[in-house]
């Protein structure tokens, strides 16, 4: 698909004009430039990557809806007008659309910048010679935040950098596009989705059964039950057996002598 082509080009493009000051690294580690995008296309690298490429997953989106703010934009005050929206859904970002409705008698005076939760900025419009009025139901789009986490506060800043013309930000909104991001809120090596839907553990507690073994360790290494602190019912916790005694937490009588481990200990 065209999205796969985008991904391949982002991953294989090379930095050009390395001395240019517009190059920066975004929140996902991609080199990006407001002049050059992701750089020059490396056709050979792109073809090689495409040969074993796995298609990207379904595109999802998060929308702020249009936010009515009716904020005056001061004339050449040196300070921008800022509006923000907090995104709670986790996407692995591809692109962001920004919608504005601005009344202004000389729109070229306006510098418009979007700042992501990562701190990465997209300059949507710089001061330029454009004597037209208004940004009426206008859409800007940026891929500068490619790969970043969508969660957190997004801020739109609008600054009038010219004299004698004033305006108002009437409405604004965001639509963020990307793929589902695997989240591991408690850092136990299991995604929140798998904890909730597969293992039924607490995605915000790394050790759901309080046996001193993380949920991820129990699922991926010891094969013990992350919701039962004594998987073999021998009166010893799984963590105590693994970390202290070295007994088998899945076998009540590790040494096969007719006495369970708990009785022997």
Residue ranges, per PLM feature:
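Residues that flank catalytic or metal-binding motifs in active/ligand-binding sites
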Residues: 5, 36, 108, 152, ...
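Sec/Tat-exported extracytoplasmic proteins
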Residues: 9-17, 50-51, 162, 198, ...
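Short, flexible coil/turn micro-motifs enriched in small/turn-prone residues
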Residues: 32-34, 147, 162, 253
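Loop and turn regions of beta-sandwich accessory domains that flank beta-strands and are enriched
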Residues: 51-183
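Extracellular calcium-associated, cysteine-rich motifs in secreted modular proteins
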Residues: 181-265
């Amino acid at each position: 698909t065209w999205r796969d082509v985008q991904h391949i080009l982002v991953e294989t493009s090379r930095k050009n004009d390395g001395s240019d000051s517009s190059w920066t690294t975004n929140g996902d580690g991609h080199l990006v430039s407001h002049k050059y995008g992701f750089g020059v296309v490396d056709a050979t690298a792109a073809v090689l990557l495409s040969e074993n490429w796995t298609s990207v997953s379904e595109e999802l989106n998060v929308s702020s809806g249009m936010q009515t703010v009716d904020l005056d934009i001061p004339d050449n005050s040196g300070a921008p007008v800022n509006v923000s929206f907090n995104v709670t859904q986790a996407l692995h970002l591809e692109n962001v659309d920004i919608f504005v409705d601005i009344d202004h008698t000389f729109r070229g005076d306006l510098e418009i910048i979007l700042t992501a939760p990562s701190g990465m900025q997209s300059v949507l419009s710089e001061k330029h010679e454009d004597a037209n009025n208004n940004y009426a139901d206008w859409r800007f789009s940026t891929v500068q935040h490619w790969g970043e986490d969508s969660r957190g506060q997004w801020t739109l800043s609008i600054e009038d950098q010219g004299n004698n013309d004033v305006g108002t930000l009437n409405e604004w909104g965001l639509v963020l596009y990307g793929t589902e991001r695997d989240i591991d809120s408690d850092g136990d090596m299991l995604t929140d989705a798998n904890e909730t839907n597969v293992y039924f553990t607490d995605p915000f507690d790394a050790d759901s059964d309080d046996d001193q073994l993380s949920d991820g360790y129990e699922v991926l290494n010891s094969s013990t039950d992350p919701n039962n602190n004594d998987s073999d019912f021998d009166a010893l916790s799984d963590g105590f057996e693994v970390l202290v005694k070295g007994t088998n937490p899945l076998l009540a009588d590790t040494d096969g002598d007719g006495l369970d481990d708990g009785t022997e200990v």
